[in-house]
C-alpha cells in the first residue's frame, strides 16, 4: 500500500476508503465535504450523482488547491425516482418495500481534481435485482441497523447481500467506488 500525501479523499464513507485501499492507495488525508446533497427539481439520477460528486471535490479543492482531491457519490433509483438515504425505520421500510422484487439502478460517479485545475470523472450505472421481500424479512433487516447511511437503505456487503438475485455492472460501484474507473483516473497521476 502506498500513502500519497498529496491525495485527499473527499468523503465520510468508510467503504470508499476501504475500496481505495484495495487499489493499494492510502490518501494523505480525508476531508468530509459539507455540501447540500438535496436533489434539484426533476434532476435525473445520473446527473444528480455527477453533480454531487463534483461539488464534493470542488468544495475541498477550494481549501487545498495544490492537492489532488478524489470524491464520489452513489445514488439508488427506481425509474427516475431518486431514493434517499433513509433517516428513520419507517423510511427504510418504504424504500425496501419499493425495491423488493424489482430491478433498481445504482449510479456512482467519481471525480478527481488535479492541482492543474483539471477535472477527471467517470460515472457507472449498475442494475441490481432484489428478491421479493416479506414484511418479516424487511423488519428483521431494519432491526440490524445496516440500512443507516446507505443509499437505497441497502448494505449488500452485509445482511442485505442475501437478498440480491443479480448485479449487472460493477459490484464495487454499488458499495461506493467503481474500482476500475477509479484506477483508470488515478493511474494517470499516481504509480499504482
Swiss-Prot record:
EC number from the UniProt entry: 3.6.1.9
GO BP term, pick one: nucleotide metabolic process
UniProt-listed SUPFAM superfamilies: ITPase-like
Cofactor(s) the protein requires to work: a divalent metal cation
Pfam families assigned: Maf (PF02545)
GO cellular component: cytoplasm
Single annotated GO MF: nucleoside triphosphate diphosphatase activity
Keyword Hydrolase set for record: yes
InterPro entries to which the protein is assigned, alphabetical: ITPase-like_fam (IPR029001), Maf-like (IPR003697)
Coiled coil: none
Primary enzyme class: hydrolase
Compartments, record wording: Cytoplasm
Protein keywords: Cytoplasm, Hydrolase, Nucleotide metabolism
Reaction(s) this enzyme catalyzes, per UniProt: a ribonucleoside 5'-triphosphate + H2O = a ribonucleoside 5'-phosphate + diphosphate + H(+); a 2'-deoxyribonucleoside 5'-triphosphate + H2O = a 2'-deoxyribonucleoside 5'-phosphate + diphosphate + H(+)
Active site (catalytic residues): 73
NCBIfam families associated with the record: maf, PRK14366.1
Function: Nucleoside triphosphate pyrophosphatase. May have a dual role in cell division arrest and in preventing the incorporation of modified nucleotides into cellular nucleic acids.
Family assignment from sequence similarity: Belongs to the Maf family.
Protein name, as recorded: Nucleoside triphosphate pyrophosphatase
Provenance organism: Ehrlichia ruminantium (strain Welgevonden)
